[in-house]
Design a protein with these regions (language model features):
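Terminal connector regions
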Residues: 494-565
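Glycoside hydrolase catalytic-domain context in secreted enzymes
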Residues: 1-500, 509-517, 523, 572-1008
Length: 1008
């Protein structure tokens, strides 16, 4: 007889299944909630559409690519990228015409960096360089015979383990973890493989291979920096520092001198290295070329330069010193902690444990004021020559190795017929110089224009500083054949000569006195020309006699405090807006600022600051927005049905009355999405048929490496190389290339270009910024911006403002003079907006004084919009962590209230909870709601005039769709929920069955 199944069996099985399905269901629900909360980031990562377009018109193309295929586009990108490095690389030294090398030269590539060339910096600006050639390949492509034994030694042999830290694509993190790690010279005696030995006679070790490839040693000296931390300027244990040669590198150069006919050094760095070694006979360097970071194709251009196929025409964008610590800005460069930091409730202002504000308990002082880079080195030099009081011990010749603007060529040029005059009708000066190629090869020449303004008793009495010379114009010739000439003409608006008087006139003034304009090869030659015009010679201590024939004197009879007090861009009055940068604003004593009236007595020193109650009010993140007392603002109309679409607004003025009709349709929730979730996009607004956009990074060309969804068509050389070209036409072409790349990849917004200042050589993000000079930075930025935006891309120029340090950069308080901020740190942004037409801005983490830059109305509204006329929108830097107190959204979103009321429009976040917080907190507040409406206006206006509207007409509609992954997650949750319910049902059923079975088999109570 078959045995029946025991009732109630399976309890253990269904218990296990119930627990398993419950755990899976709980995990799925948590995962789904997290994904839904960060839906925007997920959509970006998966390239998932959130809407579909109805009524799209493919003939409605407002911005069109210049290319019919990706192959054509990428070929043109490559050509321009190579030209960029070819014109930006700077020839520093070329003794005995070492360069160019003879065709077919047998060369050895020394340094591990030869096989690990730095193509970009670290962090969000990291680029895809998968198309970049190796250095060996680039050299072989132009006909050089490269030492294979040495190359194999670095790639597969004993030298492969000596790797630089950090490597590309990583964060700098802790500065103490920074290592150059060059291969010790002793390792070159390592025995080689049999195959390598067979490649040449008498090759037994790596060093013995040099004889067969001894025409030249090409030494690659690389330094990498980037987002997250500044370089350490203190000495390593061996007495060297990160921007000087290490002992291993010194030994390597000595070895090269012994073994090779000539030594060529390539400086693969955007942080100015100390150049004391280049002319030291101990190392025997015959030629040196600065190449910056090379991007995808820059190495091809470098090889072309060495071969003579390209004549270098770049000029330095920074002052290169023998000792970088001579810069006054380094005295107080790194962050200082408030002296009463430990006495306070640090949770109020410091939350690094939660990924928050590492700089909110810190401050920095720019005591050097305007004296950044050559503005310091050349000014103090002139004061020494003129015998100014209190100039101190200062020897220019032993301090500066290569001045700002320096650059050599393979040919020679003669300048003549300098002309300059003032044109009252245009209120500008015209400068012209005839340039003739007097050498034997074709080349391009750069003419730089500088001015000097009078340093008066009024200046000394009222805290106005004047640099000895300032760049005010430049021009570059076409490629001139030997014997060919060209007249270079430079226009200099007289407004360039004005200075900012923050203490008395509180605006820009043009003082009475003599102004000098000169054409020069570099900043030092400019000073010498002016000194010559004043009657000084080498007998007075000049490094060389200047040429007074290349100077022009303009005399301004009366101090003018009116003409330049009105913005030429908007007609608005220009006056002080940045009082919070002055320590007296918070009740402290006046900060000592470096002055040329007393170099020795005002040299910067570390300042100890105790955070007082006034300062704590501004830096305390845990505050609640309580509304505006006495406000009469009315709630705007929202959610109306006016039949408007964004397509109807294409090409209309910002102040067109139809904008109000359109904005009346937008709901509060949609405004909150635009304001609160600006991470790499602008959100869809279905009520007005606005599509979502894709926005991403791009100091070296459009890159999506941060979001990981695509590669770029081309990665260009760094911004230092861009500026070093001194070629605005080329930079506009680079911009057009980037715009075409973005059109093809379906992107509308670019987080860049960046244009902060090289305050010192040690800033982590100098590779993202053009120069130490704001005029050059602004002109190059304006050209690049104009080119990019010609393809319907809106650029976010960044980081606005004072983001000149990486260490403790998140909400560090910055103190300096308004003159320094306006003349040095804002000027590049101003030029990019007023001349380049930049549409958007990315704010900085930094504080101006104690006020976060994004909440500083003087900066974001009065200067950016009032004085400069920006009509687009501004976005915060990354604010994706709720711990970004007073920066990201925190308790009761106080910083969002501050930011919106000051003029910030969108937060670089993808967190759904932030949008919800906005909706919950401010929905009944008319002032905040009106600010959100204006932010929405700016964003919609920008997008309406971008390539995002290609295919859109007045009749085009946007319909929201549920992303596939949301449907999939919901299905998974439902299925797991059903399985949990089913397993519980079966478990209960089995338990009941088992109990019933036990009851049937149990003996009766009276049964014996």
């Amino acid at each position: 007889m078959k045995k029946g199944k025991k009732k109630g069996s399976g309890v253990v099985l269904w218990s296990i299944l119930t627990v398993l399905f419950t755990v899976l269901f709980a995990g799925a629900c948590i995962g789904s909630n997290l994904a839904f909360a960060s839906a925007q980031a997920v959509n970006i990562a998966l390239k998932t559409p959130t809407h579909k377009t109805v009524g799209k018109d493919d003939s409605a193309v407002y911005y069109e690519s210049d290319f019919s295929s990706v192959e054509e586009l990428e070929a043109h990108d490559k050509e321009i990228a190579e030209q960029l490095t070819g014109e930006g690389a700077v020839l520093l030294k070329n003794d005995n015409n070492t360069l160019p090398l003879a065709a077919g030269s047998k060369v050895s590539t020394l340094s591990h960096s030869s096989v690990d060339v730095v193509t970009c910096g670290t962090g969000s600006a990291d680029i895809d360089t998968s198309k970049a050639p190796t250095w060996k390949q680039a050299l072989e492509d132009v006909g050089f015979d490269v030492n294979p034994v040495l190359w194999d030694f670095y790639t597969n042999g004993a030298g492969k383990d000596y790797v630089r830290s950090p490597s590309k694509g990583t964060s700098l993190g802790d500065r103490s973890a920074w290592h150059i790690n060059e291969v010790p010279v002793s390792l070159y005696s390592t025995n080689v493989k049999a195959a390598d030995a067979a490649a040449g006679a008498n090759i037994t070790d790596v060093r013995s291979s040099f004889a067969s490839y001894g025409d030249a040693a090409i030494v690659m000296l690389s330094r990498v920096a980037g987002e997250g931390a500044d370089l350490e300027y203190g000495d390593f244990v061996d007495g060297t520092n990160v921007l000087s040669l290490t002992n291993e590198e010194k030994d390597m150069l000595k070895m090269a001198k012994e073994e090779f006919a000539r030594t060529i050094v390539l400086i693969n760095s955007t942080n100015a290295m100390e150049c004391d070694f280049l002319n030291d006979p101990e190392y025997g360097v015959d030629a040196a070329l600065w190449i910056g970071y090379t991007g995808s194709y820059g190495l091809n251009a470098v090889a072309d330069i060495l071969a003579g196929n390209v004549n270098p025409s770049g000029h330095l964008v920074d002052t290169y010193c023998y000792d970088n610590t001579t810069a006054p800005g380094l005295v107080d460069y790194y962050a200082n902690q408030y002296t009463n930091y430990a006495e306070k409730d640090t949770s109020k202002w410091y939350s690094v444990a939660n990924g928050g504000l590492d700089g909110n308990g810190y401050y920095t002082t720019y005591q050097e004021g305007i004296y950044v880079g050559y503005r310091y080195y050349e000014t103090r030099y002139e004061d020494v020559v003129m015998g100014t009081q209190n100039v101190g011990e200062y020897d220019y010749a032993s301090t500066v190795a290569y001045p700002f603007g320096y650059g050599m060529s393979y040919t020679t040029f003669d300048w003549s017929n300098f002309q300059s005059s003032y044109d009252a009708a245009t209120d500008s000066f015209n400068i012209s110089v005839d340039v003739k190629n007097t050498g034997s090869v074709a080349g391009k020449e750069v003419v730089q224009a500088y001015f000097q303004s009078p340093y008066t008793e009024y200046d000394k009495a009222n805290g106005i500083e004047k640099a000895s010379v300032e760049l005010c114009g430049f021009g570059k010739t076409q490629l001139l054949a030997p014997g060919e000439s060209e007249t270079v003409t430079i226009n200099v608006p007289r407004s360039e000569l004005a200075c900012y008087d923050e203490n008395v006139a509180q605006t820009y003034i043009l003082e009475a006195g003599d102004y000098y304009l000169t054409a020069a090869h570099n900043a030092h030659d400019a000073v010498n020309n002016v000194l010559a015009a004043k009657g000084y010679t080498t007998a007075n201590g000049m490094t060389a006699n200047g040429d007074a024939a290349f100077t022009y004197t303009y005399t301004n009879g009366v101090t003018d405090t009116e003409t330049y007090s009105i913005s030429a861009a908007t007609g608005e009055k220009i006056t002080n807006q940045l009082d919070s940068a002055d320590m007296t604003y918070y009740g402290y004593d006046e900060m000592n600022m470096l002055t040329r009236a007393n170099w020795t007595g005002t040299w910067p020193e570390k300042i100890a600051i105790e955070a007082n109650d006034a300062l704590l009010v501004d830096i305390n993140p845990y505050q609640s927005y309580k509304g505006i007392d006495g406000s009469t603002t009315e709630m705007p109309t929202m959610g109306a049905d006016n039949g408007m679409t964004l397509g109807m607004m294409i090409g209309k003025d910002y102040d067109d009355p139809d904008w109000d009709k359109l904005l009346d349709q937008v709901t509060y929730e949609e405004m909150a999405e635009l304001v609160g979730k600006g991470y790499h996009n602008t959100a869809m607004v279905q009520s007005v048929s606005k599509p979502a956009t894709t926005d991403d990074n791009g100091p070296q060309g459009f890159t999506q490496t941060l979001t990981g969804v695509a590669t770029c068509h081309a990665a260009y050389s760094d911004e230092n190389i861009m500026a070093a070209t001194f070629n605005v036409d080329l930079m506009k072409e680079v911009g057009i290339c980037i715009g075409n790349d973005m059109l093809d990849l379906g992107a509308s917004g670019l987080y860049g270009p960046a244009m902060n200042i090289h305050r010192t050589a040690y800033s982590g993000r100098n590779f993202e910024y053009y120069s130490e000079d704001p005029f050059l930075s602004g002109k190059i930025a304006a050209a690049e911006v104009e080119g990019i935006q010609s393809k319907g891309v809106y650029v976010y120029i960044k980081h606005f403002a004072l983001n000149d340090t990486e260490s403790k950069c998140r909400c560090i308080a910055t103190f300096t003079s308004e003159q320094a901020i306006r003349e040095v740190y804002l000027k590049s942004f101003e030029t990019a907006v007023t001349e380049g037409g930049a549409k958007c801005v990315m704010n900085a983490f930094a504080r101006i004084g104690g006020i976060w830059s994004g909440a500083h109305k003087g900066l974001q509204t009065n200067i950016l919009r009032g004085e400069w006329g920006l009509t687009g929108f501004n976005l915060t830097d990354f604010s994706g962590n709720a711990a970004f107190a007073n920066y990201g959204i925190t308790m009761k979103s106080f910083d969002v209230a501050q930011g919106l009321l000051a003029g910030t429009d969108s937060w670089d976040s993808s967190a759904q909870q932030w949008t919800s917080e906005l909706i919950k907190t401010y929905q009944g507040d008319p002032d905040i709601t009106q600010a959100m409406r204006e932010a929405t206006h700016r964003i919609l206006y920008t997008v309406a005039n971008s390539n995002a509207m290609n295919g859109f007409t007045a009749d085009t509609k946007i319909v929201g769709v549920t992303p596939w992954w949301k449907t999939a997650l919901i299905c998974v949750d439902v299925v797991l929920g059903v399985l949990v319910a089913g397993s519980i049902f079966m478990l209960v059923k089995r338990i009941k069955a088992r109990k019933a079975a036990k009851a049937l088999t149990a003996p009766a109570e009276d049964q014996e």
